[in-house]
């Protein structure tokens, strides 16, 4: 079993990233009369006693995929982490409904999961393709890589394979957090975090890369150079949504085993640059894991996992590759946008 910790793989790159100057425009200052931002917890189920990590939500909001740590007690987990799914089986009421509306979590089959760590799922809007990060070994794939499983005509998930082409997976380097990267006026794309050298002979750095499919073929990934994003050290995921005349970027920052929190920025379509001020999520707690969100395909909701109700606990990526007990939370994207606009004095 491959049980090596994320800290062992990512720690050196995180240290290198820390050398990048920290942004000086981060703000969490209060504004009188400004909108608040209070996470909403999903019912129990889909939450349960075994925890959920790094969820993704289907386009219709009725299916949630997430990872689960083995050490939290669910004996169905065969690797350090496996991917699970829960369904909203009664859909007549207001979302997310009550506990009676959701099915108990089920482990995805061995065509998806392995005896290595499998996590960071992202489901495509059509619900037929699941991308995720895995520690399993394969030719041309680094210590961690991006894998994909396609739903078969019978509704079952096919055998997962490494994502081919695009320089996404590179045999000696770490790749993780494969997420949508759709910007106004630009072709649909994906982004990921790559820990690799910027040029031949240079040290590894933690950077954002982008790629897109053309006629079903992934194009060569390019480092996404942006002054603001490059100034944020220890970033481990970048999530993007456009709603209410604003493109919001949510940066997950993670010093593995130490903290895992959220920062907000915005995109300027005229300059094609990301802008500040960088606004800290008001519910961040540097002793509690809470980051790595996904947005519903229509931009209606953000979903993520956090240990807010359990108090200080293990932060994911520690020396044992484990994590704390995390619950599923969500927020309407409109509230995120309103909060950021108020704090950033935009609009």
Please give the residue ranges for each predicted region:
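Short, conserved micro-motifs composed of acidic
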Residues: 32-347
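Cleavable N-terminal signal peptides
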Residues: 18-19, 30
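A general, composition-driven signal for non-globular sequence regions
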Residues: 1-2, 23, 155
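Short alpha-helical segments used as structural interaction elements across diverse proteins
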Residues: 3-5, 26, 234
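Low-complexity intrinsically disordered segments
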Residues: 21-24, 244
């Amino acid at each position: 079993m491959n049980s090596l910790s994320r800290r062992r793989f990512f720690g050196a790159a995180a240290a290198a990233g820390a050398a990048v100057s920290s942004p000086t425009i981060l703000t969490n200052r209060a504004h009188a009369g400004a909108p608040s931002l209070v996470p909403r917890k999903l019912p129990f189920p889909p939450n349960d006693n075994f925890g959920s990590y790094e969820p993704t939500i289907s386009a219709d909001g009725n299916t949630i995929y997430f990872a689960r740590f083995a050490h939290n007690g669910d004996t169905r987990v065969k690797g350090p982490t496996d991917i699970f799914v829960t369904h909203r089986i009664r859909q007549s009421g207001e979302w997310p409904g009550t506990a009676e509306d959701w099915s108990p979590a089920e482990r995805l089959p061995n065509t998806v999961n392995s005896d290595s760590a499998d996590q960071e799922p992202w489901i495509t809007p059509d619900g037929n393709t699941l991308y995720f990060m895995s520690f399993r070994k394969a030719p041309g794939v680094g210590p961690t890589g991006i894998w994909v499983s396609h739903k078969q005509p019978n509704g079952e998930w096919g055998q997962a394979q490494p994502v081919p082409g695009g320089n996404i997976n590179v045999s000696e380097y770490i790749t993780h957090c494969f997420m949508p990267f759709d910007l106004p006026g630009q072709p649909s794309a994906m982004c990921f975090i790559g820990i690799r050298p910027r040029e031949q002979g240079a040290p590894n750095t933690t950077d954002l890369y982008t790629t897109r499919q053309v006629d079903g073929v992934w194009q060569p990934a390019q480092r996404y150079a942006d002054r603001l994003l490059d100034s944020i050290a220890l970033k481990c995921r970048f999530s993007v949504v456009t709603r209410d005349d604003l493109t919001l970027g949510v940066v997950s920052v993670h010093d593995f085993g130490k903290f895992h929190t959220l920062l907000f920025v915005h995109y300027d379509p005229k300059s094609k640059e990301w802008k500040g001020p960088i606004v800290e999520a008001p519910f961040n707690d540097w002793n509690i894991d809470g980051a790595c969100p996904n947005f519903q395909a229509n931009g209606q909701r953000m979903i993520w996992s956090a240990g807010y109700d359990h108090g200080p606990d293990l932060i994911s990526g520690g020396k044992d590759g484990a994590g704390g007990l995390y619950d599923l939370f969500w927020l309407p994207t409109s509230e995120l946008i309103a909060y950021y606009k108020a704090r950033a004095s935009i609009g």
